[in-house]
């Protein structure tokens, strides 16, 4: 097993473990009819505060959990493979922040509906991977951004209010989704991409990209500098010799010879 395969295996451990927890919760809920969705997140409700921690673990039916499983696994592996230094921070901050924002700002309807599902976390991971790859300007990370857009680009419509999603036929009539969870999850991911932009893989810096203008001594511009010999200080011997020749100048005598004498 080479280093890349080993790294991929290590990056898959936590996403698979988290996915196993979600499926275990769903299995016990369905098998023993525990009605766990009552512990989902209810906005601006003391009883619904527990949903900040339980919302991503709870799902309404098999279709709901199945639709969330694959993107959660793929995005989670990408996060831990390419951003291993900050992967746990991004994951758990997204987990908690999404729930807190939904609890604070999501609308509470007359039916006291609860928010459940890991889709908010999925939107956070997608937002982080897309934006982080763009602002870091690293080829591999930018490629991951394009891959996420290609695979899950259409989920951007999920941040719109439900009535707009129904109008464009993104969701079926009579189906309700936690679009606030999608929106706040995506915004959380974008913010984390900016906050952690200096940590982890960075764009390579080449020698020709380095600006050395700060090293120039503007008090002595290079265009006013003389040659090395011109700037070299004269020693005392040279200065004394020059002084002596100035005090006692040489005499040069010229002799004129007529042209006829030359012939």
Where does each model-flagged region fall?
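C-terminal transmembrane module of polytopic alpha-helical membrane proteins
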Residues: 1-7, 159-263
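N-terminal TM1-TM2 helical hairpin plus the immediately adjacent luminal interfacial "cap"
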Residues: 8-90, 103-115, 168-173, 177
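Alpha-helical transmembrane segments in multi-pass membrane proteins
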Residues: 18-22, 93-94, 98, 102, ...
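Aromatic-anchored segments of alpha-helical transmembrane domains
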Residues: 22-27, 96-104, 147-158
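Membrane-interface loop-to-helix entry segments
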Residues: 62-67, 112-131, 135-141, 179-187
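Membrane-interfacial alpha-helical segments at the cytosolic side of multi-pass membrane proteins
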Residues: 68-83, 124-134, 187-199
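Alpha-helical transmembrane bundle and helix-membrane interface signal
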Residues: 81-90, 131-144, 199-203
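Multi-pass alpha-helical transmembrane bundles in non-GPCR membrane proteins
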Residues: 117, 123-171
């Amino acid at each position: 097993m080479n280093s890349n395969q080993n790294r991929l295996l290590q990056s898959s451990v936590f996403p698979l473990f988290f996915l196993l927890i979600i499926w275990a919760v769903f299995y016990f809920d369905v098998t023993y009819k525990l009605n766990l969705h009552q512990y989902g997140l209810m906005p601006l409700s003391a009883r619904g505060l527990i949903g900040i921690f339980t919302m991503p673990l709870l799902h309404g039916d098999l279709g709901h959990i199945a639709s969330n499983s694959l993107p959660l696994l793929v995005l989670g592996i990408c996060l831990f493979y390419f951003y291993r230094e900050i992967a746990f921070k991004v994951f758990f901050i997204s987990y908690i922040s999404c729930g807190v924002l939904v609890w604070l700002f999501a609308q509470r309807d007359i039916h006291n509906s609860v928010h459940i599902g890991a889709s908010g976390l999925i939107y956070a991971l997608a937002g982080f991977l897309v934006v982080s790859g763009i602002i870091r300007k690293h080829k591999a990370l930018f490629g991951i951004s394009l891959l996420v857009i290609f695979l899950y680009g259409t989920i951007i419509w999920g941040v719109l209010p439900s009535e707009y999603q129904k109008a464009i036929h993104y969701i079926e009539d009579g189906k309700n989704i936690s679009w606030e969870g999608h929106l706040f999850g995506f915004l959380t991911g974008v913010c984390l991409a900016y906050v952690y932009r200096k940590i982890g893989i960075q764009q390579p810096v080449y020698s020709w990209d380095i600006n050395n203008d700060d090293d120039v001594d503007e008090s002595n511009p290079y265009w006013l500098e003389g040659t090395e010999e011109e700037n070299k200080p004269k020693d005392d011997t040279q200065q004394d010799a020059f002084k002596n020749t100035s005090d006692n100048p040489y005499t040069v005598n010229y002799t004129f010879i007529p042209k006829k004498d030359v012939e």
